[in-house]
Amino acid sequence: MENKPYQRKGVSSNTQAGKDFENKILFFLENNGITVEPQTKVEIGINAKKEHAFDFGNNSILVECKSQTWTETGNAPSAKIKNWSDAMFSFYLAPKKYKKLFFVEMSFNQKYCKTLLEYFIDHYFYLIPSIISLRFRHGGEKITNLC
């Protein structure tokens, strides 16, 4: 078996774990009467504009899904946290007409006594636009709104 130090335990691949999580969020949205399309492209930018593909969206909602967890040693996954920061910037640059939803897999850490999302909010609050809704999947299909 290959040594994959950054491979999450218990899943065939990190990419597959992300896709599985996206499918759970899509199922949740559809069950709540929200129809979205995958890979919704929207022009974003500061001076110039370029298309950016959000995980899901429609004419009024943009959705990003992140399925990262704490590292095996209990530390924050810094490279993945950068991806979350990038998602916040993309939401910030997206047209104001969209409601922005950020879904993350719940990952609790005993050392910090908080979820990875709570850690992100505590440490990177200044990067989070006030216009987004931060949510995590907690067990089954229950979604908790943190902001």
PLM feature segments, named:
Residues Q16, D20, E51, K82-D86:
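Short, well-structured alpha-helical interface segments that form or flank functional binding sites
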Residues K41-D55:
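N-terminal interaction modules that seed assembly of large macromolecular complexes
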Residues L29, P95, Y124-Y126:
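A generic structural signal for well-ordered alpha-helical segments
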Residues C65-F120:
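Catalytic cores of nucleic-acid endonucleases
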Residues I34, N58-I61, A94-K99:
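Short glycine/proline-enriched coil/turn segments at helix->beta-strand junctions
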Residues L101-C147:
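Domain-level recognition of nuclease-like catalytic cores that cleave nucleotide substrates
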Residues M1-E43:
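Acidic-basic catalytic patches of nuclease active cores, encompassing PD-(D/E)XK
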Residues H52-Q68:
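Active-site beta-strand-loop-beta-strand hairpin of nuclease catalytic cores
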